[in-house]
Amino acid sequence: MIEKEYLKRIGENITKFRKQKGLTIKEFGYRCDIEKSNLIPIEKGRINVTVLTLLKMAEALEVDVKKFFEFD
């Protein structure tokens, strides 16, 4: 799998978990202290995300960070 595909799938998983929690992008950003303008490209798989950012997002969503890397 190429890098862009990994980023896209990670972003899709983040979006899935955010929606399962019933959070808007704005609410999610508030919970993980990340600007909405930075979250949108992450969820769309357009930018490479740091481990620290992924950990903050997982904590805000109350999921194990490994879940972001589970691809069906």
Feature names for model-found ranges:
Residues M1-Q20:
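A short, Lys/Arg-rich alpha-helix, primarily the initiator
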Residues R46-K56:
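Short, basic-rich loop-to-helix N-cap that marks the start of a DNA-contacting helix
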Residues R18, G29, A58:
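The alpha-helix within a helix-turn-helix
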Residues N38, N48, K67:
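Residues in the helix-turn-helix
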Residues E62-D72:
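Short C-terminal boundary/hinge segments that cap the last helix of small helical domains
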Residues K21-P41:
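Short alpha-helical DNA-recognition segment
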Residues T15, K26, L55:
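Residues within the helices of the helix-turn-helix
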